[in-house]
UniProtKB/Swiss-Prot annotation:
SUPFAM superfamilies: Prefoldin (SSF46579). It comes from Thermoplasma volcanium (strain ATCC 51530 / DSM 4299 / JCM 9571 / NBRC 15438 / GSS1). Gene3D superfamilies: 1.10.287.370. Heterohexamer of two alpha and four beta subunits. Keywords: Chaperone, Cytoplasm. This is Prefoldin subunit beta. The lineage of its organism: Archaea, Methanobacteriati, Thermoplasmatota, Thermoplasmata, Thermoplasmatales.
Amino acid sequence: MVEPNISSYLQNQLKQAQELEENIEKIATQRYQLDLSLKEIEKTLQELNKIDDKTPVYRSIGSILYKVDDKKKLIDELEEQLELTKIRINTLDKQQKSLEEKYKELQAAIRERYNQDNKKGAVS
């Protein structure tokens, strides 16, 4: 809860800090979902590489399963999806790091300004 005697500047800074926290949390959630997807793709590729080329392979689209005629094409698609997922994870990591740095800077600025305002209030 915001104290009523905090300056509007500090209130604005606190609001920005809360927004940064929310964005960091959203990115962490997206990162987690991509990690799950990455593991699933890797596991699928491992299993596909274990089986014989003559073994029938099925792919799930929603609630429908259909037979895959070209296992090699499916593996290529999954490997491409794997690479794209890794790129997205890397991008999210960079975004999260940047937001965390901004958050730390903002935290320091808020703390400094709050201390300055309190000193002024103590002198008055």
